[in-house]
């Protein structure tokens, strides 16, 4: 049972600056139970509840509304899936100068697809409206859970582990949230954390002066001291501070820096004046203190957090991949039987040691699947060229399979793609968001003969133009040396048994 404190969790009222930031960033600011309100349709001024949007979504009750948008519960009539649809008035956001802001938020959500981040499903538009279709998270805000009392240490640790996993992923994609707080952490029906509201987020490409943020934004009680100085700050370090505040609240049931007078509260933040409750274990107190270090240069980093003894207890790296523009999660019950690995050309949630271990495992992988006659028939022409066909390509190689894997990892490192390996299948995941999300490519190796393999390349996510450009400019030039051009050997394989040819 959660222990209920005598005083409820209190958040200070917004300052004028915070009010404006909230106005710009949080399109949904007011919850409501009104079910009579309805979204506007591209075909009529009003669409009643129960109407069908874009021949795909049945509109349900109003969940919330703000100055520029309304959010509705809806149901995908084809899959039966519940979703949340944000309906934005184009004219209002254009007049207010927020069109670029909306585009940036959509772009960021496409970039940071992760099991612990609210999923952007699709974006639709008409002449007057923008429809942002999001995952519907049933459990509500984590704030409401903590407001009833501080959490058990194991529960708080699990929420914190999921938060750090998602933040680490965002940072690896060059995205800094800048408004992490309990109200922006939702819980799904399985009790997992979902980070939401990327309205104040910034991407590394936007930053000036060697990656320094200049904008004063965020929620007062969660602001890092360097943000208050208005002299510029690193988004990653500011996010870590906010995570430290969240961890403190999860375990204490109240804010570390709190005062009715906001100037007094800012002074406490700037000086780092807080005290851990007596029920904090020494390990937890040390972790919180490292995260709430007022000096950003000595503040603990994400990799250090993930190596901390308190954090590591019971922690499992979440495993997932993007396929056909959908996020797919790999659930393994046994960490010791881990059949997939991760490496990257950029920073990621896996440590350098993990990456080295995974690369060394390649030599002990199981034998790749062999092609039978029907497989060969379906491949049709194995002439050794990089045969392209729509969203897939293949070639024959006589190179060792470990060499092919290494070359793919080398290419990924050059273009800063993430690499996920499982047996003789390699998944390359880009970080640049396209119209259909980041480019994701799967490369599979099949045994053709004891000395020949077929390497098959398929697009699993992203748009076709980006895929073709990547194949033509990156994959093909670097893999050509591994291609096998001895047609007679391939033709010999293609001589199928008479019963198959018939």
Curated annotation (Swiss-Prot):
Domain NAF: 366-387
Known catalytic reactions: L-seryl-[protein] + ATP = O-phospho-L-seryl-[protein] + ADP + H(+); L-threonyl-[protein] + ATP = O-phospho-L-threonyl-[protein] + ADP + H(+)
Similarity-based family: Belongs to the protein kinase superfamily. CAMK Ser/Thr protein kinase family. SNF1 subfamily.
Keyword terms of this UniProt record: ATP-binding, Kinase, Manganese, Nucleotide-binding, Phosphoprotein, Serine/threonine-protein kinase, Transferase
Molecular function in Gene Ontology: ATP binding; protein serine kinase activity; protein serine/threonine kinase activity
Record comment regarding domains: The activation loop within the kinase domain is the target of phosphorylation/activation by upstream protein kinases. The PPI motif mediates the interaction with the ABI (abscisic acid-insensitive) phosphatases.
UniProt cross-references to CDD domains, sorted A to Z: CIPK_C
Protein name as it appears in the record: CBL-interacting serine/threonine-protein kinase 13
PPI: region residues: 390-419
EC category name: transferase
Gene name of this polypeptide: CIPK13
Disulfide bonding pattern of the chain: none
Modified residues (Phosphothreonine): 215
Binding of ATP, residues: 63-71, 86
Source organism of this protein record: Arabidopsis thaliana (Mouse-ear cress)
EC code: 2.7.11.1
Skewed-composition ranges (Low complexity): 35-48, 340-352
Residue numbers spanned by region Disordered: 32-51, 331-359
Domain Protein kinase: 57-311
Keyword Oxidoreductase on entry: no
